């Protein structure tokens, strides 16, 4: 295992149970021969490559690799567009792949700062932050079959955010739903009805907030043992609320991202034709622009298929990927103070990509709180979930108050939070408004056209990096629904 991890794990029965589970359930992706013959994984940083349809797995060869893996003793979890997701004992994986595997811990949820993610974890990891991967690289050639290309290990993704049906009372300023819609210039009567968002996140608790307000949230059941309505983290439930704030008439389908599995599985399910999804909202990513070939190809296919794909730019200095992919719409954060003055959020990330020359992140922004903890919106979450506990007074320190705690209880199902996670979900809701208006006008919007509408109509933020746009503070600025609709009418 990674240096220094042993003593930490030995003090926690919960962590040791997770270690025992990983010894028997290591998960990895095998990319198989593609239709074009190009390998998918080496293209993860490429500016250009073959048309995405040519990079999809050759069906016959994928089938042969699956049979070979089953014969070797592995479980086939998922046969997808670009390869196969496999699960099996760590010892078997190390033997078949001819590599040394190491137990590692991803940087995780801070107990002492910022709503969700930061780079270096000062305390014990959470169970879901443990993973197994090779010691030298997260990918290696697949030597067990002539029809397989590469083996890829994907660490758990980072989530950038962080029971009464009504928000709890607090003594500090919270931006309510009506104020969010005002700042985003949402016209009265626009609800996004008829639009469908595929929200890929941690789970979707049936909070009474949704039913009381008549919001249409449908957790999608993906197979035996799947429990999409269970949200131990609380993040997915909160993100759904942000979508409905802007587009109360939209439908949100929740695709649970099991952190034991590669993220492309949930994205494929969300993008399948039978899902009926128009917009795919992703408030997560990987820091330092760490890239994965199968995930990149999956996103390219979603965009090619006409889906709107949004990713959060990250919080607290994280340089997030896939947000830096030029194909996606990257969302950052703008803070509006009590006098309605707009400024870049000092909690939201922004950067010039080192992977894609000339790429500025974010493209546009939603609303986001400021450091130290991003407490700005009061969001529903699963009672007792990680998000519920994270901001509560008793979790931070008895007697602590805003801006260091949200003044809520650890199991009341509400959390003061924000981040580029929340901003991304808001923009997903705004995309629903524009898609509904496009249908009314008999027009079609794809990812490229929608990004152009959002950037052309955004409200520039004066304090951003000298005032020029786009910039690494707020991109083109804060999204504006009414202006975007005017732009749409002129297309």
Predicted segments with their positions:
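Primarily auto-inhibitory N-terminal propeptides
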Residues: 2-64, 103
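N-terminal domain-start motif of subtilase-like serine proteases
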Residues: 89, 153-197, 224-225, 344-353, ...
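Active-site alpha-helical elements of protease catalytic centers
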Residues: 200, 213, 222-257, 414-436
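Substrate-binding/access-modulating region of protease and related hydrolase catalytic domains
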Residues: 238, 254-328, 338, 408-425, ...
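Acidic-leg catalytic submotif of subtilisin-like serine proteases
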Residues: 179-225, 311, 364
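C-terminal subdomain of the subtilisin-like protease fold in secreted/lumenal serine endopeptidases
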Residues: 277-281, 410-414, 436-491
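Extracellular S/T/G-rich loop segment that most often corresponds to the catalytic His/Ser-adjacent loop
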Residues: 323-432
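Autoinhibitory propeptides
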Residues: 64-175, 185
């Amino acid at each position: 295992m990674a240096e220094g991890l042993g003593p930490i794990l030995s003090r926690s029965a919960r962590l040791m149970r997770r270690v025992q589970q990983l010894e028997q359930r290591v998960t990895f992706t095998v990319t198989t021969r593609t239709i074009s013959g190009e390998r998918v994984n080496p293209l993860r940083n490429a500016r250009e490559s073959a048309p995405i349809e040519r990079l999809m797995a050759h069906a016959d060869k994928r089938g042969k690799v699956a049979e070979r893996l089953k014969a070797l003793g592995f479980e086939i979890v998922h046969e997808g567009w670009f390869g196969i997701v496999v699960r099996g004992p760590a010892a078997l994986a190390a033997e078949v792949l001819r590599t040394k595997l190491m137990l590692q811990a991803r940087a995780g949820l801070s107990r002492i700062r910022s709503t969700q993610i930061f780079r270096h974890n000062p305390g014990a990891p959470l169970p879901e932050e443990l993973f197994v991967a090779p010691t030298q690289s997260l990918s290696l050639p697949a030597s067990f079959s002539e029809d397989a290309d590469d083996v890829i290990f994907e660490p758990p993704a980072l989530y950038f955010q962080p029971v009464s049906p009504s928000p709890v009372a607090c003594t500090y300023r919270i931006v309510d739903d009506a104020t969010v819609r005002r700042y985003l210039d949402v016209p009265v009567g626009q609800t996004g009805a008829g639009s469908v968002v595929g929200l890929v996140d941690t789970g979707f608790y049936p909070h009474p907030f949704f039913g009381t307000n008549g919001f249409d949230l449908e957790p999608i059941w993906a197979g035996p043992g799947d429990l999409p309505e269970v949200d131990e983290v609380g993040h997915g439930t909160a993100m759904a609320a942000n979508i409905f704030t802007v587009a109360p008439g939209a439908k949100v389908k929740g695709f649970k991202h099991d952190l034991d599995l590669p993220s492309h599985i949930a994205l494929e399910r969300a993008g399948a034709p039978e899902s009926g999804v128009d917009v795919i909202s992703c408030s997560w990513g990987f820091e330092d622009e760490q890239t994965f070939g199968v995930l990149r190809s999956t996103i390219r296919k979603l965009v090619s298929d006409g889906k709107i794909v949004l990713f959060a730019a990250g919080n607290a200095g994280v340089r997030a990927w896939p947000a830096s992919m030029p194909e996606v719409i990257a969302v950052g954060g703008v803070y509006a103070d009590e006098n309605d003055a707009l400024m870049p959020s000092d909690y939201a990330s922004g950067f010039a990509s080192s992977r894609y020359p000339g790429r500025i992140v974010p493209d546009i922004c939603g609303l986001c709180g400021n450091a130290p903890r991003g407490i700005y919106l009061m969001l529903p979450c699963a009672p007792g979930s990680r998000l519920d506990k994270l901001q509560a007074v008793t979790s931070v320190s008895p007697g602590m108050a805003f801006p260091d705690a949200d003044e809520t209880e650890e199991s009341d199902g509400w959390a003061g939070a924000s981040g580029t996670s929340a901003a991304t979900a808001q923009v997903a809701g705004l995309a629903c408004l524009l898609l509904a208006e496009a249908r009314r006008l008999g027009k079609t919007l794809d990812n490229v056209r929608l990004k152009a509408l959002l950037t052309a109509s955004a409200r520039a933020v004066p304090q951003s990096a000298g005032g020029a746009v786009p910039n690494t503070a707020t991109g083109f600025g804060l999204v504006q629904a009414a202006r975007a609709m005017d732009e749409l009418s002129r297309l």
